[in-house]
Regions:
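C-terminal recognition in membrane/secretory proteostasis and scaffolding
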Residues: 1-179
Length: 179
C-alpha cells in the first residue's frame, strides 16, 4: 500500500547514524529535519516520491540513465548516506533481474557486498530507499525494499521506470502552467 500524497515540502536532513538491522528486524537511519526548504513534493508512487527542486542540482556528477535492457547481473555500487560522513559509494551485486511487468518497483534483487556497509547497517535498512544504483557508469535504479529475514538483500526499481513517472509528472505540470 502506498500512502497518497497531496503535496508537501522537501527539506534538508542531517543523518547522524543508524540502528543496525538483523534477521527479522529492519534497522533504520537516524537523523533530523533541518529548516531549509529545498523543493516541493507532489506524488508518492511504488517507484518513489516525486516533486520539484527549487534549484537545479549541479550536473558535474550527472550520469546517463540505463534502459532496463542495459541492466545486468553482477557488480554495481549504491550511493547512500548512513552516517554524518554524507553520501558514500558502497559495493552491491545485482543478483537477479525481474523482467516481468507485474511490479513497477521490484525489478531487481540486490545484495550488499560491501563489508563496511554491512558492519554499519547490517545490510539494507529503512531510510536507504531511493539510494541510487550505479553500474558501468550509468544509473540503473534505486533501492526500494529490504528482505526482512535477509537484510543483506532487497529489491530495487529500474531507473527507466522512475524516469517514466517523472516525465509524466513534468508533462502534467507543463499542462497546468499552460492553462
Amino acid at each position: 500500500i502506498v500512502m497518497p500524497l497531496a503535496d508537501g515540502d522537501a527539506v534538508k536532513t542531517k543523518i547522524t547514524g543508524c540502528y543496525k538491522g538483523s534477521c527479522g528486524s529492519t534497522g533504520e537511519l537516524c537523523g533530523v529535519f533541518q529548516d531549509t526548504n529545498i523543493g516541493t513534493l507532489s506524488l508518492n508512487t511504488a517507484c518513489g516520491v516525486y516533486g520539484f527542486l527549487n534549484n537545479i542540482v549541479s550536473t558535474n556528477e550527472a550520469v546517463p540513465i540505463a534502459t532496463k535492457q542495459e541492466v545486468k547481473t553482477g557488480s554495481a555500487k549504491i550511493i547512500s548516506t548512513v552516517d554524518e560522513k554524507g553520501p558514500q559509494y558502497y559495493d552491491v551485486r545485482i543478483v537477479r533481474i525481474c523482467n516481468n511487468d507485474s511490479s513497477s518497483s521490484k525489478n531487481m534483487i540486490i545484495e550488499i557486498t560491501d563489508s563496511s556497509l554491512i558492519e554499519k547497517t547490517g545490510g539494507i535498512i529503512q531510510g536507504m530507499s531511493g539510494s541510487p544504483i550505479i553500474q558501468d557508469g550509468m544509473l540503473i535504479g534505486a533501492v526500494t525494499h529490504v528482505f526482512v529475514n535477509d537484510p543483506i538483500r532487497g529489491y530495487a526499481v529500474f531507473a527507466d521506470n522512475m524516469l517514466k513517472v517523472s516525465e509524466a509528472l513534468n508533462a502534467e505540470r507543463l499542462l497546468e502552467k499552460a492553462s
